[in-house]
Amino acid sequence: MNVDKQRQEAQPAFVLHSYPYLETSLIVEVFTQNSGRIAVVAKGAKRPTSPLRGLLRAFQPLLLSWGGKSELRTLHKAEWQGGQLPLQGTALICGFYLNELLIRLLHRNDPHERLFACYQEALSDLSTASDYIPILRRFEQRLLQEMGYALTLDHDVSSGKPIKPTQMYCYEIERGPIASSNGSCPFNLELSGKTLLDMYQGDYLAPLTRLQSRILMRHLLSHYLGDKPLHTRQLLKEFQQL
């Protein structure tokens, strides 16, 4: 459901990306709590005396006010809320990865309040965690769920039977897991039942679960992203297999 494009006041938001516009302004992609992903023009934001200068940064909770009827709204005010620790090193790249997923997969002006809360929680977790894999996998799953493509992880979609930890399953994109009988599986998406159940419970401690869940999510996301690869995924590969 699209939201009203008229004036919005003090709406919680995060900057996803920004780029220069004309000589002194910025176009900013933001993820908002009640309006979803929108684009705003921050007029004069690059001027040394602008109150917006240095404020429109990624991963910092903001309160934004804007107006306008076009696809590109005009930012009127931004306030820093605080409370979010800065992301550094691999955590910073993970944050940019989440931002790129939101930009690429969410339609503008569609509210996703639960996903906004999940994103905020993921940023908080990234700032303190030493293991980033569970954070990324959970967010990826929630994102697909919000898009209407929730993963089936607890039962065989062909037979309806509960997943067995010792059984191997072939995961069919846009359907779900089916018990594997001959070992052949499209895109090599064969997973153990334990991996599926671990993902269902959000448990990514087992090495095989970490490996197979990464392969599964990479294929699922690529299916919805299309041919254009994610820039941040290559950066993550250079650091570690996330």
Curated annotation (Swiss-Prot):
Pfam family, one: RecO_C
Domain of life: Bacteria
GO biological process, one term: DNA recombination
UniProt xrefs under InterPro entries: ARFGAP/RecO, DNA_rep/recomb_RecO_N, NA-bd_OB-fold, RecO, RecO_C
Gene Ontology CC entries for this record: bacterial nucleoid
Annotated keywords: DNA damage, DNA recombination, DNA repair
Biological function: Involved in DNA repair and RecF pathway recombination.
UniProt xrefs under NCBIfam families: reco (TIGR00613)
Family of this protein: Belongs to the RecO family.
Identification of the protein by name: DNA repair protein RecO
Organism: Nitrosospira multiformis (strain ATCC 25196 / NCIMB 11849 / C 71)
Organism lineage: Bacteria, Pseudomonadati, Pseudomonadota, Betaproteobacteria, Nitrosomonadales
